[in-house]
């Protein structure tokens, strides 16, 4: 990548922030979600794909562009699938390969769920009376939801998980990228501006005095 050698005195946090921005730009410009789960017979596409960096150098993300989104549907890939640079013959020494594999092993805690399974489990944990409505009003938001193919893949997998054929899966996605990226914040700001919601607010003093039980009194 690049280093802050051209900006002496810059705080490391500033460099990290822009590095994350660069990763986000690469993710949003290159990543694609496979429409179906990969198999040995039909693996993920790893054809060459270059992204131009701020210093005009080219970064080959042929492997990452399809594997990164796939982790949302198959978290075990973080444990089992090393990028080419950390595979034997990829340019890294044995110590780097072992360190990379060990780090990946620790990235996925036990019980880490795939996105479709997480949605389905969340709905199952709700009252039976509202499950049908929840299956029909699944909202996707955030930057990762903009990955091409993700909404379609999620919809297809949820159709396999829905408990009754009479329940219809419907995914709702804000139309513009900015609306989808900040949908959670926009929704929260609208909710906070409602007079009826302000009656449910709790001050720190109330919480310190009554504890968590005060929440149930205000939001029965």
Task: Set out the residue ranges of the language-model regions.
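C-terminal region/appendage detector
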Residues: 1-220
């Amino acid at each position: 990548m690049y280093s802050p050698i051209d900006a002496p005195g810059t705080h490391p946090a500033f460099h990290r922030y822009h590095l994350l921005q660069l990763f986000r730009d690469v993710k949003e410009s290159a990543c694609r979600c496979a429409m179906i789960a990969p198999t040995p017979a039909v693996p993920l596409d790893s054809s060459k794909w270059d992204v131009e960096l701020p210093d005009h150098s080219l970064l080959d993300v042929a492997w990452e562009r399809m594997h990164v989104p796939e982790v949302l549907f198959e978290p075990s890939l973080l444990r089992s699938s090393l990028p080419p640079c950390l595979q034997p013959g990829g340019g890294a020494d044995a110590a780097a390969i072992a360190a990379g594999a060990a780090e990946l092993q620790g990235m996925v805690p036990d019980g880490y769920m795939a996105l479709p399974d997480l949605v389905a489990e969340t709905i199952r944990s709700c009252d039976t009376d509202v499950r049908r409505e929840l299956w029909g009003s699944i909202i996707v938001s955030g930057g990762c939801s903009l990955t091409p193919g993700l909404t379609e893949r999620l919809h297809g997998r949820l159709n396999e998980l829905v408990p009754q054929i009479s329940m219809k899966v419907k995914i709702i996605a804000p139309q513009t990228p900015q609306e989808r990226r900040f949908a959670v914040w926009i929704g929260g700001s609208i909710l906070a501006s409602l007079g009826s919601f302000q009656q449910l607010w709790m001050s720190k003093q109330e919480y310190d005095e009554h504890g968590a039980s005060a929440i149930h009194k205000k939001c029965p």
